[in-house]
From Swiss-Prot:
Name of the gene this protein is made from: purA
Protein's name in the database: Adenylosuccinate synthetase
CDD domains referenced in this protein's UniProt entry, alphabetically: AdSS
Catalyzed reactions per annotation: IMP + L-aspartate + GTP = N(6)-(1,2-dicarboxyethyl)-AMP + GDP + phosphate + 2 H(+)
UniProt cofactor(s): Mg(2+)
Provenance organism: Xylella fastidiosa (strain 9a5c)
First-level EC class: ligase
HAMAP family: Adenylosucc_synth
Length: 430
């Protein structure tokens, strides 16, 4: 039987999953995206060249690797086509290696309009979405109004479903938000064009995954966003609209729990968050700005500055428990170079009580005060180091503390953006 590894974010997203997925795809059968949409931004740096992927799995830069988009992903036709064409312009063969589940829902133009209208109307209470229609597309999926890739094969039924969806969404857009509605014929014609484009890539992703496992091939499941943004387990309502946990990998790709051999949780050596929502260890000072500048902490999808703070072990332990994380990968260690001292949040003060567990609601998180352990920093550069022994003693001590406090072994340490800037302590496929 083959080996399957799930790579997912153990914080609020932007942990560096794309680089690690690319790193682990050297000898692999397939990479599958199982949730989210083009709100993800996975940045890869190979031989100094930067590539940002939003929808296509990060394994696409490896020749011969099959890339799958599962039923749990919501697909923007325009974004998919743009990303394919940009990659093909670099000389890569894309469409023959990209397979898309017919059950994947489509992000329609009215989803984007609704997303943006809501954020504008919310004003200061806005969640901070990317405004790309992700949430409304998932709403239609649950409300059984969604249009899926499979529907494109049946023009008459597509027209009927599109009319029904537009009746609903145009009513909301015009009557509730006071913005223009959408034209049926234009959207329908665009969908017919996209139907021809996507048809050769349409395939039974779940079936492919089962066959690969029987053939003894390695499969990597690539998560987007992070555990603390999960629709069920995150800081609701400041969350994404999909399941970002290992449970989402199972349902979003169509495999069983027995098909997963290893869960790799990715976490930065500090913490970041984009948009609104609680963030107990946030550093709204020159220390936080310094981390942002050194770490180039600006969203790959939106360009928005990320909020930066100290490592939060309470939150990390929650992610480890929810996902059954087998091993951790700590990224961006080099961003902490040159800092006199570092802090790790080990507990919260909440209503005059100390707790090592995270509250179950966003308001509770907002009312938490972090309890810190302090560690000495290091002046030496860790950038590009590939050996544990060559790390400064203080950096090793910091990582060992993270490992012990989180109750989960560290298998990989990333010391820079390039594929080679990595310390591999334990290969998840070994």
């Amino acid at each position: 039987m083959g080996q399957s590894v799930v790579v997912l974010g153990a914080q609020w997203g932007d942990e560096g999953k794309g680089k690690i997925v690319d790193l682990l795809t050297e000898e692999i059968g397939a990479v599958v995206r199982f949730q989210g949409g083009h709100n993800a931004g996975h940045t890869l740096v190979i031989n100094g060249k930067k590539t940002v992927l939003h929808l296509i799995p990060s394994g696409i830069l490896r020749n011969g690797v099959l890339c799958l988009i599962g039923n749990g992903v919501v697909i923007s036709p325009a974004a998919l086509r743009k990303e394919i064409e940009e990659l093909e312009d670099t000389g890569l063969e894309i469409r023959s290696r990209l397979k898309i589940s017919p059950a994947a829902p489509l992000i329609m133009e009215y989803h984007i309009a609704l997303d943006q209208a809501r954020e504008k109307a919310a004003g200061g209470r806005a969640i901070g979405t990317t405004g790309r229609g992700i949430g409304p597309a998932y709403e239609d999926k649950v409300g059984r109004r969604g249009i899926r890739v499979a529907d494109l094969h049946y023009p008459d039924q597509l027209a009927e479903k599109l009319r029904d969806a537009l009746d609903y969404h145009n009513f909301v857009l015009t009557r509730y938000f006071g913005v223009d509605g959408m034209d049926f014929q234009r959207i329908y014609d665009e969908m017919l064009v996209f139907a021809e484009y996507v048809e050769p890539m349409k395939s039974d992703v779940a079936g492919i995954l089962h066959d690969l496992r029987k053939q003894g091939k390695r499969v990597l499941f690539e998560g987007a966003q992070g555990t603390l943004l999960d629709i069920d387990h995150g800081t609701y309502p400041y969350v994404t609209s999909s399941s970002t946990t290992v449970g989402g990998a199972l349902s979003g790709a169509g495999v069983g729990v027995q098909d997963i051999d290893y869960v790799l949780g990715i976490a930065k050596a500090y913490a970041t968050r984009v948009g609104g929502g609680p963030f107990p260890t946030e550093l709204d000072d020159e220390i936080g700005q310094g981390i942002r500048d050194r770490g180039v902490e600006y969203g790959a999808s939106t360009g928005r500055p990320r909020r930066c703070g100290w490592m939060d072990i309470v939150a990390l332990k929650r992610a480890v428990a929810i996902n059954g994380i087998t091993g951790l990968c700590i990224t961006k260690l080099d961003v902490l170079d040159g800092m006199d001292k570092l802090k790790i949040c080990i507990a919260y003060e909440y209503h005059d009580k100390r707790s090592e567990y995270a509250p179950l609601d966003a308001q509770g998180w907002e009312e938490c005060t972090p309890v810190y352990l302090e560690f000495p920093g290091w002046n030496e550069s860790t950038h590009g180091i590939t050996s544990w022994e060559k790390l400064p003693p203080a950096a090793r001590a910091y990582l060992c503390a993270l490992e012990e406090l989180a109750g989960c072994p560290i298998g990989i340490v990333s010391t820079g953006p390039d594929r080679e800037h990595t310390i591999m302590l334990h290969d998840p496929f070994a």
